[in-house]
Structures are given as C-alpha cells and as structure tokens.
C-alpha cells in the first residue's frame, strides 16, 4: 500500500526540480535504476532474460 502511494506521489510534477528522482517504472524501486531504460537492475535482468529488451545479451567471457 505504501509503495503504491509513493508511486502516485512520484508521478506528479514536483514543486522544485531537485526533488525529482528516478524510480523503476515497473516496481517503483528507488535504488539502482538504469536511466536509459527507466527500470531497476532487478526488473532489467528479468526483462533481459525474457528477451523483451532489444539488443541486450547476457555477457560471458
């Protein structure tokens, strides 16, 4: 419940630009968000494994 309220609050335009911060578009997680994709590292990993992010491959060396 609290996370839903925070996501609703986050979706509004802040009074000052410095108050804005990145959140995951899927789960609302505030940490480890990849700006290019707009999702957190956990959701990014899941989407990459499903093949939903074009051009993304698992690295192995």
From Swiss-Prot:
Native organism: Clostridium beijerinckii (strain ATCC 51743 / NCIMB 8052)
GO molecular function: rRNA binding; structural constituent of ribosome; zinc ion binding
Keywords from the named record: Metal-binding, Ribonucleoprotein, Ribosomal protein, RNA-binding, rRNA-binding, Zinc
Binding residues for Zn(2+): 24, 27, 40, 43
Keyword Aminoacyl-tRNA synthetase tagged: no
Stored InterPro entries: Ribosomal_uS14 (IPR001209), Ribosomal_uS14_bact (IPR023053), Ribosomal_uS14_sf (IPR043140)
Gene3D superfamilies attached to this UniProt entry: 30s Ribosomal Protein S14, Chain N (4.10.830.10)
Cofactor note (record): Binds 1 zinc ion per subunit.
Keyword Metal-binding: yes
GO BP terms, alphabetized: translation
TM helices/strands, residue ranges: none
Quaternary context: Part of the 30S ribosomal subunit. Contacts proteins S3 and S10.
Protein's recorded name: Small ribosomal subunit protein uS14
Summary of the function given for this chain in its UniProt record: Binds 16S rRNA, required for the assembly of 30S particles and may also be responsible for determining the conformation of the 16S rRNA at the A site.
GO cellular component terms listed in the entry, alphabetical order: cytoplasm; small ribosomal subunit
Family named by the database record: Belongs to the universal ribosomal protein uS14 family. Zinc-binding uS14 subfamily.
Cofactor(s) listed in the protein's UniProt record: Zn(2+)
